[in-house]
Amino acid sequence: TTVVGLLLVYNFSTPLFAEDSLHYLSLHAHMGIIGWFLLLIIGVGSRLIPMFLISKYTNASLLWWVYILINLGLIAFAFMFLYMLPVYFYLLPVAAVTTALLLFGYYCRQAYRQRLRKQVDEQLKISVLSVLMMALPVILLIIMIISLWVAGENIRLVLAYGFTVFFGWITAIILGMTFKTLPFIIWNKVYHKKAGLGKTPNPKNLFSNRIFTGMAVLYLTGFVLFVTGILLSVVFILQIAALLLLLAAVLYNFNVMKIILHKPAIL
């Protein structure tokens, strides 16, 4: 992804490709989204979600199939893009990636069903929700391909697709996993020498759960409204949604700083 991006930058001044750099922007974006973000999140999620659920479920062969299907889909997309095949051919790589996501969803579902921890906290719920939210850009992409094939490009669908990728499952798993991992990291840094000398705070007490809940509500409401505003082209809805997402970001940063600036306390 980095090499392609660098080549596209040089292509602005020195012709390296047959077309201008903007023509290859879609290829570069999907190499980053699928080849980097998606594989990274699935890799991290496949380890952290079962771990925090305290689940005994494991299935390495299924995860290998997820990995293979995603990479096959990405390679097929790059081939079709470079050779400018008809738009309906793009349904094949979409089908491969969709199958991979369904398999990963099955993996997470089995991990959830075989969990030892029966009560699931809000942070993990958001992380699990991010897995379900992966379906939204896939659905929009299928609609977008069919629309492009039948009636031409639909800018609103393109914008909604991009938004649901970056502000959907990517943002959701970051919001959830931040408050599952960061408190443990800071707790270990602050209290690793004090453990056993007295009662120390629980890692989950290093941040405000009420603020996290408020952040989650603002984020999900803002996300739904923003997608609605894009599809309906209603500026007022977009403005309200942007405000809600901004407030969610403020609460997120407040809680993160609360964790980072935590001072030692023996109870």
What residue ranges belong to the model's regions?
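Hydrophobic alpha-helical transmembrane segments of multi-pass integral membrane proteins
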Residues: 1-267
